[in-house]
Amino acid sequence: MKINLILPTYENEDLTLKCLRSIKKYLDKNYEPNIIWVDNGSSEKSKNQILKYLKSNLSFDNIYLECNVGFIKAVNIGLKFALEKYPKNKFIGIINNDIEVSNDWLKNLIDCFKDDVDDKVQCVGSLCYDSNINDLTQFDKRLIGDEINNISEHNFIEYVNKISNLNCQKYVEFNYSNFKKDNFTYTYVPYYSVIFRTSIFQKIGFLNENYNLGYADDTEFNYRICENGFTIRKAIKSIVNHIGKSTFKLLYDENKIFNIQESNRKQLRISKMLNQDSLKKNVIYTCISGNYDRLIELSNVDTKNFDYICFTNSDLLLEKNIFPWKIINVKDFNIDIDLSDTDYYVKFARFFKLHPHLFFEKYEKSIWIDGNINVIGNLSEYLNFLNDFNYLAIPIHPFRNNIYEEIFACNRLGKETNEKLNIINKFLINENFPRNTNLVQSGVLLRKHNNDKCIFMMNKWWEMIKNYSKRDQLSFNYVFWKYGGKYLGIPWDLLSKTYFTTNYRHGGTK
């Protein structure tokens, strides 16, 4: 049986070679691994060493990426390649390059599918010996029970030998109820060594690239498997030695890694909490950060067709109950902006404004409204501005025609520092950005937020806000001009008479 194993790498060729040598050492003629090697922009030296070894020792396909696109995207590229090239294969796997496998690791994974006559089991993963603590992970030790505690000297080989001789069940199975009960505390089956039925990717899609470089992506995909009525298993006698975080440590310090982990976990919990129960297709949302804005009661509410979500890091707001808003605590959410940044709280709100795709997976359309915007009309009608040909509708500014005029107005009204305004003005001039581009008023955004093009444009817009100015209207038109984005501009006069009104100026003042 030929089994494709997706292996993403970035530098760390010594670890990759150690992993590949262990696979070679424990080859089983009945389970032939084919390595789908996806290199994430490593140096030529690193790639050549791995290529040389693979050519002489293992069956493989190689995919070279020009730059590091992150673990998740690299895995998805490998999965799609393998599924297209080898469409008849029943199983496919993912492995990390910082693992060592052990005797029968692959056989023991596949064996856990054999009693599943209804194809309900879609994913089986290995136990993890964590070389950083010279022990099994606490979660995996609990799965095995007391017998494993009799090991006198903690090392990988002794654990493998001990567990191989245990008279115990082949696997432990997990389902949807496990995730519902523990609120995503556990991944259950991490993806450092895992086998899937290939059919699962046609059924529920691929790994969620909204988790960027990695962490919580495996928890999210496992949840999706179980949410769709399938189960996952952990193979008790398939054991790998895992270093963990090896690629991340090349890129970031420990504090940054911790922040990425915590943010992704928080994102996962919020996303699933918001999406698992609602049957509605549309959401209206906002974010109140610090004292920049305040939440208002809307004049026109339609709870039949919309959910209403307010993200906030404000302790005062978290204590309130304001109809129809469901208030979501995001105090601990990390947006990769330093707390010392004087614009932190404004940029915090901007993050949620530009990233609905991270939280509203099951909603088809979203309407963002700034905290000072009131709804006065029927927003079910407003949704019709989106059609098959556009993914974003936004008001056109009623007074100014272009970004350069907006820069001047921001300076006159004191809405941004002169230094930042000068920097973005010079940047736009150097980019040859044209003057007549119909400046937008971004207090209201209507989007098909899960559209791939929309996600791309929102990410680019966020980069501009992070690097230049908190005033998002100073960068929207540039981003859509630069990257060929398309949007529908709606006259603000039309919207303000029919759907929206402004209750107060930003900052919470009348």
Predicted regions and their residues:
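Glycine-rich, basic loop-to-helix element that forms the pyrophosphate-binding segment
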Residues: 65-85, 345-356
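A recurrent flexible, glycine/aromatic-enriched loop bordering the glycosyltransferase active site
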Residues: 159-198, 430-447
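Conserved donor NDP-sugar-binding/catalytic core segment of glycosyltransferases
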Residues: 104-159, 386-392
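Short beta-strand-to-loop acidic/aromatic patch adjacent to the donor-nucleotide binding site
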Residues: 88-100, 365-372
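N-terminal anchoring/stem segment of glycosyltransferases
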Residues: 1-52, 276-349, 362, 467-471, ...
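Active-site donor/metal-binding and catalytic loop motifs
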Residues: 212, 234-253, 490-508
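Acidic donor-binding/catalytic loop of UDP-sugar-dependent glycosyltransferases
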Residues: 45, 99-112, 373-384
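A short, conserved alpha-helix in the catalytic core of glycosyltransferases
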Residues: 187-196, 200-205, 211-238, 465-483
